[in-house]
């Protein structure tokens, strides 16, 4: 690009640069993920100050540079200011932004991903705090499905046999293997590890645990039910409601917490990198306070 160009983008990340500039990571509909400098954005009276905030959607005029592009003008189309009303809502939004940054391509249109992110940010903005985990879990699964990397939860990844939750046995569990790519009826066989070693591995890895450990969990019947609903009820587009899926409040928050952690482990294992925003998610929801029970 030899001259200025226009794009519609949402700010996903902002970092201080120099004395008064701001370095922005933006997802645009037309050009995918870009990094631009917002000159003087940190000055008190800068016209780019508010427009360079997180989750602000702008019509952008950008001047290409040798290493970094420069933001010349920005006209705000919409913003998701209410995401900051609760720490849990803001953290969930940052979680999604982090995942989108990992998924988005550069120098290619990303219209569907852009619309998908905005759809879930709008949903989060309107959700009561008790439903944040449910909306986040739906959004994460939808983003994984969009990228073609959603976990298999309808059948065993090893035997390809269908799996049905068993509610008659209160101790019934099904394995979920990040390495195998989803549910497995024989966790030891799927991971080629002895059962004693599997049982000694923590279900939720510590912050210091590397993603290469390929963590696993055991799902209860209700947790598998939710994951199977998520995989079969995805809307055909961001503007279409979820079909055949109970409202977020239908399941208790602890179930959604288990779903989020399972999907988080899967993502971190697949991408071989941590979801840094997840640390705050743990602070918000674990252990669950009475408000979230």
Swiss-Prot record:
InterPro entries: ARFGAP/RecO, DNA_rep/recomb_RecO_N, NA-bd_OB-fold, RecO, RecO_C
Entry GO CC: bacterial nucleoid
Transmembrane segments: none
Disulfide bond entries: none
Function: Involved in DNA repair and RecF pathway recombination.
Annotated family: Belongs to the RecO family.
The protein's name in its UniProt record: DNA repair protein RecO
Species annotation: Cyanothece sp. (strain PCC 7425 / ATCC 29141)
